[in-house]
Swiss-Prot record:
Originating organism: Cryptomeria japonica
Gene Ontology MF annotations: chlorophyll binding; electron transporter, transferring electrons within the cyclic electron transport pathway of photosynthesis activity; metal ion binding
Post-translational modification Phosphothreonine, affected residues: T15
Binding partners and assembly: PSII is composed of 1 copy each of membrane proteins PsbA, PsbB, PsbC, PsbD, PsbE, PsbF, PsbH, PsbI, PsbJ, PsbK, PsbL, PsbM, PsbT, PsbX, PsbY, PsbZ, Psb30/Ycf12, at least 3 peripheral proteins of the oxygen-evolving complex and a large number of cofactors. It forms dimeric complexes.
Removed propeptide positions: 1-14
Official protein name in the record: Photosystem II CP43 reaction center protein
Similarity comment: Belongs to the PsbB/PsbC family. PsbC subfamily.
InterPro entries: PS_antenna-like (IPR000932), PS_II_antenna-like_sf (IPR036001), PSII_PsbC (IPR005869), PSII_PsbC_sf (IPR044900)
Bilayer-spanning residue ranges: 69-93, 134-155, 178-200, 255-275, 291-312, 447-471
Keywords on record: Acetylation, Chlorophyll, Chloroplast, Chromophore, Manganese, Membrane, Metal-binding, Phosphoprotein, Photosynthesis, Photosystem II, Plastid, Thylakoid, Transmembrane, Transmembrane helix
GO cellular component, one term: chloroplast thylakoid membrane
Length: 473
């Protein structure tokens, strides 16, 4: 029977330039992988693979700490965060650290502490990574059976899955505890333009929480991305954290059922492909969340969403022209529709002009001016507050668009500030990374399935011309 990890299938064309650079158990002859194949050389060396993973975690945490301190060093409190190219400080501010009413940054010391803590953590992880990569045991199965594993051991693999799920659940509950007990988090919907508050009235009703999953992803429905209040958001984390923890305990205590043993491929490369698929889904969801959602990603820190900037422009000019004597309720625009206000097909009063396509935007600076049937004309005439005018004028000139001409009616040139919105950065990067992770999933899933089926696509390595050529060195 052909073994799953036959080295034959791996022999690459390349030969090593310098044989002295190799380490036993990590060279081409013993693993079937050349040095540039990275961690693939460590598939069957659990101790060394542990070192690679811990070192990788150290690099990630080092980036977080160093970038955090870099952003703190460059931060100017007088300017909004989204004008300064920051992507880490907005996350810390959203968690309620260093923020006052209206999203004003009142204290940067918590951000400094965060950066230093991450740097110290990265040093610990870096040391652990180097230790396990160079000094620690090559395999863990003999000395530390709890941490050892064989890729084909289905029971052990689901136990490891369970441990990971419990850790994810604990992470979800960390946010819950911060929101409930440790100072609260920033709520962009707090009266008067946003503030930090403790969440006291969690939404735990399953029909509300799981109702988000049943929503359409299109239009005003918006699937889970449509969450617009912190009670639902934190309640969702309670549910998700509980499901992850109980699911983790389940996977630790049980063995995979027969249907699961048959359905999945049980190899290291298969697990890699499953993980890449999960990360891809996370990336796509994060992309949509940061682009469309101004509750989880408050506009005070990340800048306005596209629809928000467009509606802000309509509002800003309505305010200006109303002061100059325009009758905003009846003025006609160039197309014969309302210039400032019009009715949606279902009868709500909405902003007129190109921004009509964004009529279902909800934003904290606009909602107080709505009545039971859309925008309230009497409120628009009498109740507009200075903070709403300031905020909409600011958002109008900071659309998350990279265009030289008008898009969705937003002035993106001449009157606008030349900047790239963190929403643009974060949405684009997560979409691109999500896409590449999906391609990686397809690639590794295909290889894993082919190996499990006992065949490989490709040329027969025994008859390659390079094997008869003189080695380069």
């Amino acid at each position: 029977m052909k073994t799953l990890y036959s080295l034959r299938r791996f022999y690459p064309v390349e030969t090593l330039f310098n044989g002295t650079l190799t380490l036993a158990g990590r060279d081409q002859e013993t693993t079937g992988f050349a040095w540039w194949a990275g961690n693939a050389r460590l598939i069957n060396l659990s101790g060394k693979l542990l070192g690679a993973h811990v070192a990788h975690a150290g690099l990630i945490v080092f980036w977080a700490g160093a970038m955090n301190l870099f952003e703190v060093a460059h931060f100017v409190p007088e300017k909004p965060m989204y004008e300064q190219g920051l992507i880490l400080l907005p996350h810390l501010a959203t968690l309620g650290w260093g923020v006052g009413p209206g999203g004003e940054i009142v204290d940067t010391f918590p951000y400094f502490v965060s950066g230093v803590l991450h740097l110290i953590s990265s040093a610990v992880l870096g040391f652990g990574g180097i230790y396990h990569a160079l000094i620690g045991p090559e395999t863990l199965e003999e000395s530390f059976p709890f941490f050892g594993y064989v890729w084909k051991d289905r029971n052990k693999m689901t136990t490891i899955l369970g441990i990971h799920l419990i850790l994810l659940g604990v992470g979800a509950f960390l946010l819950v505890f911060k929101a409930l007990y440790f100072g609260g988090i920033y709520d962009t919907w707090a009266p008067g333009g946003g503030d930090v508050r403790k969440i006291t009235n969690l939404t735990l009703n399953p029909s509300t929480i799981f109702g988000y999953l049943l929503k359409s992803p299109f239009g005003g429905e918006g699937w889970i991305v449509s969450v617009d209040n912190l009670e639902d958001l934190i309640g969702g984390h309670v549910w998700l954290g509980s499901i992850c923890i109980f699911g983790g305990i389940w996977h630790i205590l049980t063995k995979p059922f027969a249907w699961a043993r048959r359905a999945f491929v049980w190899s290291g490369e298969a697990y890699l492909s499953y993980s890449l698929a999960a990360l891809s889904v996370f990336g796509f969801i994060a992309c949509c969340f940061v682009w469309f959602n101004n509750t989880a990603y408050p506009s005070e820190f990340y800048g306005p969403t596209g629809p928000e900037a467009s509606q802000a422009q309509a509002f800003t000019f309505l305010v200006r022209d109303q002061r100059l004597g325009a009758s905003v309720g009846s003025a006609q625009g160039p197309t014969g529709l309302g210039k400032y206000l019009m009715r949606s097909p279902t009868g709500e009063i909405i902003f007129g002009g190109e921004t009509m396509r964004f009529w279902d935007l909800r934003a904290p600076w606009l909602e107080p001016l709505r009545g039971p049937n859309g925008l309230d004309l009497s409120k628009l005439k009498k109740d507009i507050q200075p903070w709403q005018e300031r905020r909409s004028a600011e958002y109008m000139t900071h659309a998350p668009l990279g265009s030289l001409n008008s898009v969705g009616g937003v002035a993106t040139e001449i009157n606008a500030v030349n900047y790239v919105s963190p929403r643009s950065w974060l949405a684009t990067s997560h979409f691109v990374l999500g896409f590449f992770f999906f391609v990686g999933h397809l690639w590794h899933a295909g290889r894993a399935r082919a190996a499990a089926a006992g065949f490989e696509k490709g040329i027969d390595r025994d008859f390659e011309p390079v094997l008869s050529m003189t080695p380069l060195n």
